[in-house]
Regions:
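Individual transmembrane alpha-helix segments
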Residues: 9-21
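Membrane-embedded glycan transfer/ligation machinery
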Residues: 3, 14, 25-29, 88-89, ...
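A membrane-interface helix-boundary motif in multi-pass transporters
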Residues: 46-50
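Alpha-helical transmembrane segments in multi-pass integral membrane proteins
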Residues: 8-9, 35-44, 66-209
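Alpha-helical transmembrane segments
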Residues: 53-61, 124-129
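Conserved beta-strand->loop/alpha-helix structural units within folded catalytic cores of enzymes
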Residues: 19-34, 91
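Single conserved hydrophobic/aromatic residue that forms the stacking wall/gate
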Residues: 1-7
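Transmembrane alpha-helical core residues of multi-pass small-molecule transporters
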Residues: 25, 32-33, 57-60, 149
Length: 209
């Protein structure tokens, strides 16, 4: 897509290249999960293999971002690199092995029982508030964003996912509000297309945008 514009304008669409990160993860992680499934003898063993593989890849890729942050003045090379920016996905993989969906672990069942509704909602709301504060004080051109910001945001996001998962288990007879289902179905599509469309139309409409 960027090659359809002059070279001097290619940076305008650089934002869309970050989406390739998800494609890389979905393809490579699926292959690794398939490889481990062929060698696991039980569901529990498979879950453990996935957890340790996810943990190892998480630490390796995060440390790659951490170290490279000291070695470059252009943080875009870190942010748009799949190798250094992929670690939050592996954190999510670790969390998925703990919570499960169709096959829930006994430890997660105990965790659901030990959390009150108040605690669940507090963690969910507190994590969201923490992410909002991070967005105000850690810009993308700050060294601290790459040393600690992305890690802190990943931990907060995992806390939100965990609390939402527990909330789901605690409210089996409750239906999600229709507005939340609508946002869940459309938000990613809007994110995927808003930036290239904005750039393309702004070239033709100028200030009318």
């Amino acid at each position: 897509l960027t090659h359809s514009f002059p070279t001097r304008r290619s940076s305008d669409l650089l934002h869309t290249w970050s989406l390739a990160l998800e494609v890389h993860y979905y393809v490579l992680w699926a292959l690794l999960a398939w490889f481990l499934a062929k060698r696991a003898k039980t569901v529990g063993q498979y879950r453990g293999m996935l957890f340790f593989a996810s943990s190892g890849l998480f630490l390796f890729t995060f440390l790659s971002m951490f170290i490279r942050a000291f070695l470059t003045a252009n943080f875009s090379t870190i942010y748009f690199s799949s190798f250094t920016h992929i670690f939050p996905f592996f954190a999510g993989s670790c969390l998925a092995t703990v919570t499960g969906i169709a096959n829930v672990s006994p430890n997660f069942t105990k965790l659901v029982q030990s959390w009150s509704m108040k605690k669940t909602l507090s963690v969910l709301g507190g994590s969201f508030a923490f992410l909002f504060v991070l967005s105000l004080f850690l810009p993308f051109d700050s060294l601290w964003t790459y040393l600690f910001g992305f890690l802190a945001a990943t931990i907060a996001a995992c806390a939100m996912i965990l609390s939402a998962r527990i909330l789901h288990e605690k409210t089996p007879d409750k239906k999600e509000p229709a507005i939340l289902n609508f946002l869940a179905d459309t938000s990613y599509g809007v994110y995927l297309f808003h930036w290239p469309f904005f750039i393309i139309f702004s070239q033709h409409l100028g200030n009318m945008m």
